[in-house]
Amino acid sequence: MNPNQKIMTIGSVSLIIAAVCFLMQIAILVTTVTLHFKQCECDSPSNNQVKPCEPIIIERNITEIVYLNNTTIEKETCPKLVEYRNWSKPQCKITGFAPFSKDNSIRLSAGGDIWVTREPYVSCDPGKCYQFALGQGTTLDNKHSNDTIHDRIPHRTLLMNELGVPFHLGTRQVCIAWSSSSCHDGKAWLHVCVTGDDKNATASFIYDGRLVDSIGSWSQNILRTQESECVCINGTCTVVMTDGSASGRADTRILFIEEGKIVHISPLSGSAQHVEECSCYPRYPNVRCICRDNWKGSNRPIVDINMKDYSIDSSYVCSGLVGDTPRNDDRSSKSNCRNPNNEKGNHGVKGWAFDNGDDVWMGRTISKDLRSGYETFKVIGGWFTPNSKSQVNRQVIVDSDNRSGYSGIFSVEGKSCINRCFYVELIRGRGQETRVWWTSNSIVVFCGTSGTYGKGSWPDGANINFMPI
């Protein structure tokens, strides 16, 4: 091949290569533009029709990056559809409760800036659990912590952290509140926050970080709510609120809220005589609450809430092993399912229970007179049989030598069933421990298990002599 032919051959090959490269670049450009402007489509599970993603609420915005000849193409995939929770799965079958979380707030307060709190509770969104408490507007190692035994001051705020994270200085203050409830409807958080004068308090309803509605005191006597999670089904949330005497007749109302707006209010009906500090759980399609009778009964009231027609019924837990403190000893205590037992009814403590077929799972202080120790057990026939006392599967959560406090329920949706969990408030400081001037708490959390479990005790554990005064 002579030199001219070589030059022509090389030139031809070069032109072919250049043309191929040019066509590839055009193809890459077309692909990039197409992917950029192509409307993302998602298959609707309800009717198998293709719908655009734009009007759908985005939970996670996932980006896939594809590398093609040094050209980066970002492909935005369709996000998951975020829906209201309906809690339609069955309740998990359990053999007892297993340890889940403990925040050790008081022990950590001996050497760190941790909030002074009380009235803690736990609630979960569809992906994560959070702990809440009512802060006293001060850390423990701070002179403002003196005399924080008082419940209602204007500096109290609702605190919110991931479960297991103590309330440190960076903790979010959700709202102003000395009484509260929170729940997630599947799309956003609802917070019910009560604050103000005892005789004319205000409940603010905060949804998705915005104040949406409010309601004032209707009996001018300490408007108050659950101190544990509310419950939302298909976009409607319900919360139990009481205004009136803590040791006599009070006015309890059940509020129904949609995206922060009050849509209906139902009065309490049924046989319950006094209801406050309810611990509520979803019982699809309705909601059930176990509450505190601070007037006549040491057996706990039940409030059944119909989420469709807003009707209310109430009664009392049938178990003769009653759940409130103070109470009679187990040999003499009783309950007939319909009425308060008139046994040491004046005063009490927030608590919980939940139905399990004919039986009832419940928790209570070990001491019948003081907020000391904590135990759980199942009462056979305790949901339907008056004065039933057959106890099985007893567990000690906090031994009787250590302090406890409020307790409440929260629900967690699993793949196939809804699990019931509970928390126990571990109170320290005044009034029992007078070496210090503050009153605060830590928490311990357990959840239902179908497995086996051992024994133990999970008290607060702080040495009061190590603590700031």
Swiss-Prot record:
Q: Where is this region: Hypervariable stalk region?
A: 36-88
Intravirion membrane side: 1-9
UniProt biased composition (Polar residues): 334-343
Ranges in the Virion surface compartment?
31-469
Q: According to the UniProt entry, how is activity regulated? A: Inhibited by the neuraminidase inhibitors zanamivir (Relenza) and oseltamivir (Tamiflu). These drugs interfere with the release of progeny virus from infected cells and are effective against all influenza strains. Resistance to neuraminidase inhibitors is quite rare.
Reactions that this protein is recorded to catalyse = Hydrolysis of alpha-(2->3)-, alpha-(2->6)-, alpha-(2->8)- glycosidic linkages of terminal sialic acid residues in oligosaccharides, glycoproteins, glycolipids, colominic acid and synthetic substrates
Membrane-protein topology? Single-pass type II membrane protein
Subcellular localization, as worded in the UniProt entry: Virion membrane; Host apical cell membrane
Residues annotated as region Involved in apical transport and lipid raft association?
11-33
Entry GO MF terms: exo-alpha-sialidase activity; metal ion binding
Q: What's the stated role of this polypeptide?
A: Catalyzes the removal of terminal sialic acid residues from viral and cellular glycoconjugates. Cleaves off the terminal sialic acids on the glycosylated HA during virus budding to facilitate virus release. Additionally helps virus spread through the circulation by further removing sialic acids from the cell surface. These cleavages prevent self-aggregation and ensure the efficient spread of the progeny virus from cell to cell. Otherwise, infection would be limited to one round of replication.
Assembly information from the UniProt record: Homotetramer.
- The name this protein carries in UniProt is Neuraminidase
Give the source species. Answer: Influenza A virus (strain A/Swine/Hong Kong/3/1976 H3N2)
